[in-house]
């Protein structure tokens, strides 16, 4: 066990274009092989495209998409007496945001549009409207937690 206490939390730098820490977090999730300028171009292009397509503020669209994708419950494996149970637990706020961003970017990469900018834009628009694969992932996660509610007393 470390004796120095908990590690200090990292402060997220505010995005220079939109002034939102969520945009910075999205850029960092899109980032591959340290190419931050490429990731910024993809994210800014997707947000501009979402603004042109929906007519709404892109940061509002991003927040609405995240709210529709953030899970409130998830299952964690817990081993009790030789059997492994899927125990439903509540998700902390920071983890739910991280999971939502991870799912949005992951399902954007799996889409069939030509460029990553288009894929991310369409996934954000779909998620903000309550559609898309990332929203389905959240529903599946909640369904799994609901079906394993009988093991909730194993929570730690």
UniProtKB/Swiss-Prot annotation:
Gene Ontology CC terms, in alphabetical order: small ribosomal subunit
Key words of the record: Ribonucleoprotein, Ribosomal protein, RNA-binding, rRNA-binding, tRNA-binding
Any single Pfam family the record assigns to this protein: Ribosomal_S7
GO process annotations (BP): translation
GO molecular function, a single term: rRNA binding
Origin superkingdom: Bacteria
CDD domains reported in the protein's UniProt record: uS7_Bacteria
SUPFAM superfamilies reported in the protein's UniProt record: Ribosomal protein S7 (SSF47973)
Known role: One of the primary rRNA binding proteins, it binds directly to 16S rRNA where it nucleates assembly of the head domain of the 30S subunit. Is located at the subunit interface close to the decoding center, probably blocks exit of the E-site tRNA.
Similarity field: Belongs to the universal ribosomal protein uS7 family.
Self-association and partners: Part of the 30S ribosomal subunit. Contacts proteins S9 and S11.
Protein name: Small ribosomal subunit protein uS7
Organism in which the protein naturally occurs: Frankia casuarinae (strain DSM 45818 / CECT 9043 / HFP020203 / CcI3)
């Amino acid at each position: 066990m470390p004796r120095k206490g908990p590690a200090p939390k990292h402060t997220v730098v505010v995005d220079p274009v939109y002034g939102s820490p969520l945009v910075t977090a999205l850029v960092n999730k899109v980032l591959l092989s340290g190419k931050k300028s490429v990731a910024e171009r993809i994210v800014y292009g997707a947000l501009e495209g979402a603004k042109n397509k929906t007519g709404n503020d892109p940061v509002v669209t991003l927040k609405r998409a995240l709210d529709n994708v953030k899970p409130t419950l998830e299952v964690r494996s817990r081993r009790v007496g030789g059997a492994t149970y899927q125990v439903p637990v509540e998700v902390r706020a920071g983890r739910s945001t991280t999971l939502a961003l991870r799912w949005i970017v992951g399902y954007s990469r799996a889409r069939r549009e030509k460029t990553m900018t288009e894929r991310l834009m369409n996934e954000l628009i779909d998620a903000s409207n309550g559609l898309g694969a990332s929203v389905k992932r959240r529903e599946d996660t909640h369904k799994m937690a609901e079906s394993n509610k009988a093991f909730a007393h194993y929570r730690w």
